């Protein structure tokens, strides 16, 4: 069986890229009736020549009412005045149809009745000349727009879509720095802003000028604050490693570790290493190595912050950032966080509900220290008892036995 007897399904949809070299048939006589555009038969296919379906009309023998539609105007509603907001696309016939070829048609936007009102009958002058491609002359308030204007304006009035014409719109190249067209540019070159030194100020729009000057001033103040903070951080030396923090070899180490209750200078890596020491008690490792003031947490920062108000803002931003991360100890309700309500991380269940902060309980130990814990479990008590540090009296006993042995041997210890 030859493939030329099979209709190309890509050609039926209008997307065959093989063209005349296709191995399948490109004869529309073998195509199915479903490939005919039903919107074109109704007279208002918005795709026009770009439609993938066939813009052909059945003959009069195939259907009486449908066949006569090919010789009539697509829709009588196009000739009746309606509100300009109700707009659709209509196809104007430009040439006679040849079998096997797609007609070339021009897409024109017309007013269309969408309110369900009774439509006027077709004028006799239009029916008398079915092959004519002439259209009724639209009135000034029904001026047809192009398809591109309809896309830009959202099928609304073109003049209402933009507040300025091309001559009143600012040139984007001049606003970015330089326009190669110069004085020949069709767009408007704005005035130079005194802060950013760019041509971004519209000469005829005072509101745009005020808005840009406000944004530009806020940006300028923010950049100045960063410059002052960088200048104040250049000579800061870490009190542990005794190196200038911003002059370290690794870029990851050029960060400050700011203590919440202290103003001494440390780099982030050194103060974290200090607070991770295991040979000291918790109050010692949480205190400043110089002034011994206890700080609950360390805030990483690119710049050095010494002012208390700035530090409070930095602490709040740090807490908000930590509050967005899930706590690895809580594990969405499966685990227990040892920090309780003091934890800075997010305690949330799998459904997104936040866990209510649990009040820690106090316990007085035999050594006189107060311990805080959230829950009491038997295994925690046993594990704590097994790991409790007991003073080693073996050295004391051996010293006493040695002194007793020396006394019995008649050897007197020399006094200083």
From Swiss-Prot:
Zinc fingers, RING-type, are found at 238-292
The Gene Ontology terms for molecular function here are: RNA binding; ubiquitin protein ligase activity; zinc ion binding
Specify where the region named Disordered lies, as residue ranges: 113-142
- Looking at the UniProt record for this protein, which Gene Ontology cellular component terms does it annotate, in alphabetical order? cytoplasm; nucleus
**List-wise, which residues carry Phosphoserine?**
139
Q: Where is the composition biased (Basic and acidic residues)?
A: 113-122
Would you kindly state one Gene Ontology biological process term found in this protein's UniProt entry? spermatogenesis
Keywords per UniProt:
Cytoplasm, Differentiation, Metal-binding, Nucleus, Phosphoprotein, Repeat, Spermatogenesis, Transferase, Ubl conjugation pathway, Zinc, Zinc-finger
Ranges of compositional bias, category Polar residues: 123-136
Q: Does the keyword Metal-binding apply?
A: yes
Top-rank taxon of the source lineage equals: Eukaryota
Subcellular localization is given as: Cytoplasm; Nucleus
Please give the pathway this protein is involved in. Answer: Protein modification; protein ubiquitination
EC identifiers of the protein? 2.3.2.27
Q: Does the keyword Ubl conjugation apply?
A: no
- Tissues/organs with expression: Expressed in sperm, with significantly reduced expression in sperm of patients with oligoasthenoteratozoospermia (at protein level). Widely expressed with expression in testis, ovary, small intestine, colon, peripheral blood leukocytes, fetal liver, bone marrow, thymus, lymph node and spleen.
**Oligomer and partners:** Interacts with PDLIM2 (via LIM zinc-binding domain). Interacts with RELA.
Q: What is this protein called?
A: E3 ubiquitin-protein ligase makorin-2
The species is: Homo sapiens
């Amino acid at each position: 069986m030859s493939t030329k007897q099979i209709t190309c399904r890509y050609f039926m949809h209008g997307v065959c890229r093989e063209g005349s070299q296709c191995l399948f048939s490109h004869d529309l006589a073998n195509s199915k009736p479903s490939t005919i555009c039903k919107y074109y038969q109704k007279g208002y296919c918005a795709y026009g020549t770009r439609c993938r379906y066939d813009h052909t009309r059945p003959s009069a023998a195939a259907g009486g009412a449908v066949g006569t539609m090919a010789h009539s105007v697509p829709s009588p509603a196009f000739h009746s005045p309606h509100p300009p907001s109700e707009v659709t696309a209509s196809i104007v016939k430009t040439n006679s149809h040849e079998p096997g070829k797609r007609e070339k048609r021009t897409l024109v936007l017309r007013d269309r009745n969408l309110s369900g009102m009774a439509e006027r009958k077709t004028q006799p002058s239009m029916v008398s000349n079915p092959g004519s491609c002439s259209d009724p002359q639209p009135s000034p308030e029904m001026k047809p727009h192009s398809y591109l204007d309809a896309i830009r304006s959202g099928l609304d009035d073109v003049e209402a879509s933009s507040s300025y014409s091309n001559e009143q719109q600012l040139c984007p190249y001049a606003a970015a720095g330089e326009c190669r067209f110069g004085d020949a540019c069709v767009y408007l070159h704005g005035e130079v802003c005194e802060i950013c030194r760019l041509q971004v100020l519209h000469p005829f729009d005072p509101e745009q000028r005020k808005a840009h000057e406000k944004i530009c001033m806020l940006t300028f103040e923010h950049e100045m604050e960063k410059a002052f903070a960088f200048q104040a951080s250049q000579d800061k030396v870490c009190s542990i490693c005794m190196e200038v923090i911003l002059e370290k070899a690794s870029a990851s180490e050029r960060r400050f570790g700011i203590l919440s209750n202290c103003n001494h200078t440390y780099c982030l890596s050194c103060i974290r290493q200090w607070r991770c020491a295991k040979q000291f008690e918790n109050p010692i490792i949480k205190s400043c190595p110089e002034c011994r003031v206890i700080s609950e947490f360390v805030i990483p920062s690119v710049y050095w912050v010494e002012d208390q108000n700035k530090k409070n803002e930095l602490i709040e931003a740090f807490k908000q950032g930590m509050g967005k991360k899930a706590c690895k100890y809580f594990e969405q309700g499966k685990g227990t966080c040892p920090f309780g309500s003091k934890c800075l991380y997010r305690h949330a269940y799998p459904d997104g509900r936040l866990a209510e902060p649990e009040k820690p309980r106090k316990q007085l130990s035999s050594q006189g220290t107060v311990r805080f814990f959230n829950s009491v479990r038997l295994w925690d008590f046993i594990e704590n008892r097994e790991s409790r540090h007991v003073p080693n009296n073996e050295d004391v006993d051996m010293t006493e036995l040695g002194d007793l042995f020396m006394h019995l041997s008649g050897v007197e210890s020399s006094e200083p």
